[in-house]
């Protein structure tokens, strides 16, 4: 939990258990890893490049969080998302 608190007010990427990739500014987190992101968007991967879907403020339930990581803003801005070809992530299977 303390590690995640160091990400507050920073840009993070959240990978969800159903395979979604959501990027935004971490505004809140609780003991069950419920996550509040602001200014966020989802990146949908396909063989036609990455589609960016604006979400605004978004709450992700802790049960749905697979991974949270800090995003390097400078590197992220250099990416040409239309040129990145990738299959969508598959959901986590327990």
Curated annotation (Swiss-Prot):
The keyword Transport does not apply. Its main location: nucleus. It is found in: Nucleus. Keywords: mRNA processing, mRNA splicing, Nucleus, Ribonucleoprotein, RNA-binding, Spliceosome. One of its GO terms (cellular component) is U4/U6 x U5 tri-snRNP complex. PANTHER family: LSM1 (PTHR15588), U6 SNRNA-ASSOCIATED SM-LIKE PROTEIN LSM8 (PTHR15588:SF9). This is Probable U6 snRNA-associated Sm-like protein LSm8.
């Amino acid at each position: 939990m303390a590690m995640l608190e160091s990400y507050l007010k920073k840009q993070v990427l959240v990978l969800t258990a159903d395979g979604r990739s959501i990027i935004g500014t971490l505004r809140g987190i609780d003991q069950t890893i419920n996550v509040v992101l602001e200014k966020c968007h989802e990146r949908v991967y396909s063989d036609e490049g990455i589609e960016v879907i604006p979400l605004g403020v978004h709450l992700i339930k802790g049960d749905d969080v697979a991974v949270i990581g800090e995003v390097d803003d400078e590197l992220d801005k250099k990416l040409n998302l239309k040129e990145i070809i990738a299959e969508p992530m598959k959901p986590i299977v327990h």
